Amino acid sequence: MLILKVFVYALILIFVSLFVFGLLSNDPGRNPYDDTGELMREVFYKDPYKGPL
């Protein structure tokens, strides 16, 4: 029973740490604001008639 408890706690710790490090990552897809705090509209809206950005 102790082994199961340790395994469950370790599994929870792994998932929580993945979640926290995912939030702290500097991925622009997860962080739609640029360095100045302005929303990067190119992430959400790409004009198909304008061509590649």
From Swiss-Prot:
GO terms for biological process: photosynthesis. It comes from the Eukaryota. Belongs to the PsbI family. The gene is psbI. Its main location: plastid. Keywords: Chloroplast, Membrane, Photosynthesis, Photosystem II, Plastid, Reaction center, Thylakoid, Transmembrane, Transmembrane helix. It comes from Euglena gracilis. PANTHER family: PHOTOSYSTEM II REACTION CENTER PROTEIN I. PSII is composed of 1 copy each of membrane proteins PsbA, PsbB, PsbC, PsbD, PsbE, PsbF, PsbH, PsbI, PsbJ, PsbK, PsbL, PsbM, PsbT, PsbY, PsbZ, Psb30/Ycf12, at least 3 peripheral proteins of the oxygen-evolving complex and a large number of cofactors. It forms dimeric complexes. Pfam families: PsbI. It is a single-pass membrane protein. One of the components of the core complex of photosystem II (PSII), required for its stability and/or assembly. PSII is a light-driven water:plastoquinone oxidoreductase that uses light energy to abstract electrons from H(2)O, generating O(2) and a proton gradient subsequently used for ATP formation. It consists of a core antenna complex that captures photons, and an electron transfer chain that converts photonic excitation into a charge separation. The lineage of its organism: Eukaryota, Discoba, Euglenozoa, Euglenida, Spirocuta. SUPFAM superfamilies: Photosystem II reaction center protein I, PsbI. One of its GO terms (cellular component) is chloroplast thylakoid membrane. This is Photosystem II reaction center protein I. It is found in: Plastid, Chloroplast thylakoid membrane. Coiled coil: none annotated. The chain crosses the membrane at residues 1-21.
